[in-house]
């Protein structure tokens, strides 16, 4: 079967994958009290090497640590898996025995406390648009949708039409989208839980905020006018304009990551 390059959602690195493979990501959201610097140091110097070794041992595909820009004591760790089978069989990633083999010194855990603040939901990555530069900041968009296909179609069209131009105009722009596979809650036939997510990257916080800011009397950009019309037309053809009933946006800084290199 023909292979294509599946870009890890929040990373420039590429991996080869079959078209029908199911690539997963799991979120671990937490809140930390105490010494934030010590917490970050523990993850960079102890847990990151263990995560990297787990990739080499094919226990998972990648590890990332993000910190909230607006609430600096909040973090989200993203774990990547090449398949549901890899997720199911992944064990002892942060094993003390492995740490000993690697010569890692246990961090001082007395200077901070952490607690998990949300279910560790598993998402399927279905769309990725990767540029040629690193994203150091991310806009995370959480969505509620009733029609999965509309959500998927809309984001695939965004990746194909809009993201390509964004990558020309904005350094560090990378984009990806995924759907929640492990939790859904309906009330009166309406989705009340967030069941979709997308990420839009930027090289710097300045760039990200500038791109999102309102600009008065901005000149019409004919290129973007044309792209916007094409995107709108294609979305209407697919019937994917009303793809979400709610949206929540947060901004995150990339603290560290490893893909086994």
Predicted features along the sequence, with ranges:
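Short S/T/G/P-rich N-terminal loop/turn motif that feeds into the first structured element of a domain
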Residues: 17-100, 104-261
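Basic side chains
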Residues: 2-3, 26
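Sec-dependent N-terminal signal peptides
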Residues: 3-13
